[in-house]
Amino acid sequence: MKDSKNSPGPSLLDFPRPSVAVDTAVLTVSEGSVCVLLVRRAEDHQHRKWALPGTFLRERETLADAVLRCLREKAGISGRVPRQLQVFDEPSRDDRGWVLSVAHVDVVPLVALEEALKSDGVRLASVTGEPDLIAGLPYGHADIVAKAVEWLRAVYAEAPDPGALLDEPFTLKDLRELHEVVAGAPLMRDTFRRYMEPKLAGTGQMSDGTRGRPSRLWVRGG
């Protein structure tokens, strides 16, 4: 009889293994809307379809390195530090086979995307203004966008401008208008001021009044 204690266990090769992809939702605000960056696919599968920047993990490559490589090669974006969002494991999300997607998210000021957007293969899509485009994204990317926007709203509910979407300095009105875009709903002015003002640092300066009465100017931090 074999001694089960000394018999070798199953090899890792005995288990089915999915491919692992990374897909990144790069979010910004443009023309009064939360937008996500899309790239036109050059690969044969879903050729020329708009999709989130994504790639398969290479052997011995970290997830973070794969994300940075993908953003650099497919979207012309570098110098960012996207964060992991969620693993999407629906088995039917990719008709080529079993693929796990480790989704990432990044919030980027519009000005930092200007160079990338010069490419015909890169565009912004309004999350609320172009619902058909978002819903039709391949590989379950619409679910990733929805989760990324949910995350964005959660972090902006707690902090003034964690994604540095506003140029500094700014007025409380500027900040509230940004938060209304992110939230997708109007916000009570006084409630917003009481909650956010302690999280800001005053500059001691006033706006020039070109958009109404002069107002105090603020920067992030407090």
Model-derived regions: residue spans:
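NUDIX/MutT-family hydrolases
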Residues: A103-D106, E114-Y156, L165-L178, T191-E197
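Short histidine-centered catalytic/ligand-binding loop motif
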Residues: L52-R60, A164
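Charge-enriched amphipathic alpha-helical scaffolds
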Residues: P186-G204
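Short helix-coil junctions and helix-kink-helix linkers
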Residues: E177-P186
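Long, intrinsically disordered, low-complexity Ser/Thr/Pro-rich regulatory/activation regions
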Residues: L200-G222
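Active-site segment of metal-dependent pyrophosphate-handling enzymes
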Residues: P18-V22, C35, A64-L68, R72-R123, ...
